[in-house]
Each structure stands twice: as C-alpha cells, then as structure tokens.
From Swiss-Prot:
<comment type="similarity">
    <text>Belongs to the ABC transporter superfamily.</text>
</comment>
<keyword id="KW-0813">Transport</keyword>
<feature type="binding site">
    <location>
        <begin position="37"/>
        <end position="44"/>
    </location>
    <ligand>
        <name>ATP</name>
    </ligand>
</feature>
<dbReference type="Pfam" id="PF00005">
    <property type="entry name" value="ABC_tran"/>
</dbReference>
<keyword id="KW-0547">Nucleotide-binding</keyword>
<protein>
    <recommendedName>
        <fullName>Uncharacterized ABC transporter ATP-binding protein YcbN</fullName>
    </recommendedName>
</protein>
<dbReference type="InterPro" id="IPR003439">
    <property type="entry name" value="ABC_transporter-like_ATP-bd"/>
</dbReference>
<dbReference type="InterPro" id="IPR003593">
    <property type="entry name" value="AAA+_ATPase"/>
</dbReference>
<dbReference type="InterPro" id="IPR027417">
    <property type="entry name" value="P-loop_NTPase"/>
</dbReference>
<keyword id="KW-0067">ATP-binding</keyword>
<feature type="domain" description="ABC transporter">
    <location>
        <begin position="5"/>
        <end position="233"/>
    </location>
</feature>
<dbReference type="InterPro" id="IPR017871">
    <property type="entry name" value="ABC_transporter-like_CS"/>
</dbReference>
<dbReference type="GO" id="GO:0005524">
    <property type="term" value="F:ATP binding"/>
</dbReference>
<dbReference type="GO" id="GO:0016887">
    <property type="term" value="F:ATP hydrolysis activity"/>
</dbReference>
Length: 307
C-alpha cells in the first residue's frame, strides 16, 4: 500500500513531557482522513509537524513519497493547510489576501481566486476588508486559501469552527468534491463526529499523544449494532414488563428515563403493546444504530474495534 502521508514513530517532547508519542499514521491518496481525539490529545501538534510549523523530537515523516524536513520546499508547495485560527491582513479584502498568497506560493493563476471564493460562498463580498468578516467567514476564507493552489494534500484543523449548520453542510459537500472530483487527500480534525461520520473514509483516534487506532469507516459501520431506544418516565415498571412479560433480558438502562433494548428479534409493536397494557407511559421509542460517537467513546474508554 502506498500512502500520501506516513509517519513512523513520530514523537514530540516539550519541556521534558511527551505530547506526541510514537505515532505511526497512514493516509491513502484521495481519501478523507478524520482525525479524532479529546482536547489536548496532540492532534494540532501532529498537524503542525506535518506542515513544518513544529519540528519533531524524533521519528520520521514521509509525504508524497519523500522524507519530510523543514527544507522540503517542493513538498510544502503541494500542501494546503489551515491550522488553528486563520490569520489575514485585516485591512485588505478577501481577494487581496488570496492574491498575496498566490504571490507567496509562486502560483500565477489569478482566475483561481474567484473560483475558490465562489466555492466557499464568499464571492459576493470579495471586495470587503477582512476586518468586517465574522468568525465563520474567516474560516471559509481560510479554507479558500488552503485550496487555492489545488494542492495534493489538505490539512485542516477544526475547519468548520464558527459556521452555522447551513455553512457546515456546504463545506462538507465541498470536501467531498475536493476528494472525489479533484483527487485531493484531506486530513481533517474535528469535534463534530457526526460530520466526520458523513465524509471520512478512514479515521484515526488519538488520546494522550498516542494513536489508539486507525480504522476505515466501513469497518466502523460493520460494527454497528441495531437497537431500540425507549424513553419512559416509568422506567422501573418498563424494565419489569420487558423482562417478565416479553422475556427480553438484553437491555441497558442509560439514565432515569432511557432504556436501550438490544434484542435482535424484538418487535417495536409488541413492546409498545405490552407497555401500554401495563400502564407504562411512552415518551418515545425508536430504532437506532450505534454511531461513530458511540465507537469513539468506547475507544477512548479503552476498547478497540478489533477487541
């Protein structure tokens, strides 16, 4: 397998403390790689090492088949990135900021500026100074700058921060287009697991500086468990009915109102009928599946998909 990004034993130490420990990542060409982990897990530090903003203490980075160092200028020219908060010249317009980026990168396709502004829905305000932009607009401009030169690799740290739900949806669709139609490889960190679940081909989960697992979303979905989620104010009585009336024992109490029923053959209609006949009030009852969030929480708590 050939990877567009590979790290071997990547480690970073600050003031005697390892914040990234022996991380070996593998990102395939053209895929969207969702990078997940709690705050302070090391995601941003790794992204900074992949873009030469931070020097590794030890380990190896290979990008586009080349061993990566702070002098790998040709490789850096094929990487677009937005890490932490995007910074611009506030008194310049969106168009002028992107024009400066073209000059800096030696990229002489000025038509691309209007194309990327259109892609992130900023074309109508390209003449306004950036200091008038909202946080969400600056995030979109940061994404526009990252994709401006049509790089092979995009590294994006929390790219939808500050966006409203409609803006998030449009950026999600843009990422899918960049991957599927432009052939770009995307490494995206995000706290919005539902968004990553919709677009990622592979996820990597990190905790306390250590990569816990890399797994395809196909494998995560293959682990999905179907269940019925029952919400009732009469939980004790409901549990009695499930066990004694319906002989259902594979269920779990989540909180004072919510019960998850994992019986594969359980019928919602039969459960509903039995509960009603026994004077159990039903606030809601729905068939659901385990999600990326369920998997993530389970993994962070010490269980892997391969366990």
């Amino acid at each position: 397998m050939t990877y567009i990004v590979q790290t071997n034993g990547l480690t970073k130490t600050y003031q005697g403390k390892e914040v990234v420990s022996n991380v070996s990542m593998h990102i395939k060409k053209g895929e969207i790689y969702g990078f997940l982990g709690p705050n302070g897990a090391g995601k941003t530090t790794i992204m900074k090492m992949l873009t030469s903003l931070v020097k590794p203490t030890s380990g190896e980075i290979i990008i586009l088949g080349n061993k990566f160092t702070h002098t790998s200028y040709e490789v850096l020219g094929n990487i677009g990135s937005m890490i932490e908060y995007p910074i611009f010249y506030e008194n310049l317009t969106a168009e002028e900021n992107l024009d400066l980026h073209c000059e800096y990168m030696g990229y002489h396709n000025k038509k691309a500026i209007q194309e990327v502004l259109d892609m992130v829905n900023l074309k109508q305000i390209d003449k306004k100074p950036v200091k008038t932009f909202s946080l969400g607009m600056k995030q979109r401009l940061g994404i526009a700058r990252a994709i401006l030169t049509k790089p092979d690799l995009l590294i994006l740290d929390e790219p939808v921060n500050g966006l409203d739900p409609l803006g998030i949806k449009k950026i999600r669709q843009l990422f899918q287009v960049l991957s599927k139609e432009y052939g770009m490889t995307l490494l995206i960190s995000s706290h919005l697991l539902g968004e990553i679940e919709q677009i990622a081909d592979t996820i990597g989960v990190i905790r306390d500086g250590r990569l816990l697992e890399e797994v395809s979303m196909e494998d995560v979905r293959g682990q999905n468990t179907e269940y019925i989620e029952l919400v009732t104010p009469n939980q004790t009585r409901a549990c009695f009915v499930l066990e004694k009336e319906l002989q259902l024992t594979n269920f779990k109490i989540l909180n004072e109102k919510t019960i998850r029923i994992y019986e594969a053959e359980a019928s919602q209609a039969a459960i509903s009928k039995a509960l009603i006949l026994n004077d159990v009030d039903i606030e809601s009852m729905n068939k659901k599946y385990t999600s990326l969030e369920d998997y993530f929480i389970k993994l962070i708590n010490g269980n892997s998909i391969s366990a």
